[in-house]
Amino acid sequence: ATKSPYLIATSTIGYVQVRPCPALAMKVIRLPAIHHDGNAVLVSGQLGHILVDAGTSWYQSLQVERIRGQINDASIDRILLTSRRFPVSGGALHIAQAFGDVPIHIHCDGQSAMETGDFFTTWASRFDSDMPQTPTVEVEENEIIPLGDGELQAIALPGHSPDGLGYHIPHLSTLIVGTLLPRADRPTRWDLPGGSLLDIVASFQTMKRMNLKSIVPLQGPAIRGQEHIQEVLSRHLDFFLEAVNNDGQPPTSWHRPAATALWLTPLAPWPLKEQESV
């Protein structure tokens, strides 16, 4: 069976049978966040289609239709999650079932919360929502998921959540980060279950070293351009380092975040070049 030209070996995902697809350039399509949802990102290559993050359960049926609108009669092959948090994971089970029970992958530190439907550490409780009990498969740090004409690599980016991952597309110098970077003008919170300010600092230092050309944040359009990305990451990193020196606290003048917000809101707005088009 492993002699098939359409079987690709990976470390924990195992052998994945895929059908040959027309020779198309790899595509990365952002499905814009709706309301409390995070961005969902459809990555398509010669060997199939992968969905990175799924949004909440609130718009899961609409999410399925949006995906089908992009891939027509094809199916996604798997779902990769950047963390357990409800705005990126809540819709994963419904979407997986809609496409024939495709596997859902997450860092091992997030598996128990997903599989038990933990509404506290996923933060679903703050949205007055149940967290679906979601079977998952571990994705390892630095694991490579090939798509034929490109690949995704799982990068450990803990801090907002201990199971935080980013998915790097090396040949496009693109990173999909989820809740670690809510938006260019919104620093992430570290006071949610499992959050760690020091891990956030380390993760932002990791992202700066990658010299990326594009970052897909939790919400809003991609942040583009190496110089602009370095400016955004430095602004966030400097803020987090100041918080470390302030006994792990944000400025007292900043407003308390809403229960559903995964980010802090600066009192004086930070720059935001990326605007969602309607």
Residue ranges of each PLM-predicted region?
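Accessory terminal helices/loops
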Residues: 6-16, 201-214, 218-278
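Hydrophobic/aromatic beta-strand patches that form the interior of the parallel beta-sheet core
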Residues: 29, 80, 105, 137-139, ...
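Active-site HxH/HxHxD metal-binding segment of metal-dependent hydrolases
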Residues: 58-61, 68-145, 235-243
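Short catalytic-loop micro-motif centered on adjacent basic/acidic residues
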Residues: 50-53, 75-81, 154-156
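Conserved beta-strand hairpin/beta-sheet module of binuclear metal-dependent hydrolase folds
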Residues: 18-71, 166-180
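Metallo-beta-lactamase
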Residues: 56-58, 151-158, 162-244
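N-terminal amphipathic/basic-hydrophobic helices that include classical n-h-c signal peptides
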Residues: 1-24, 45
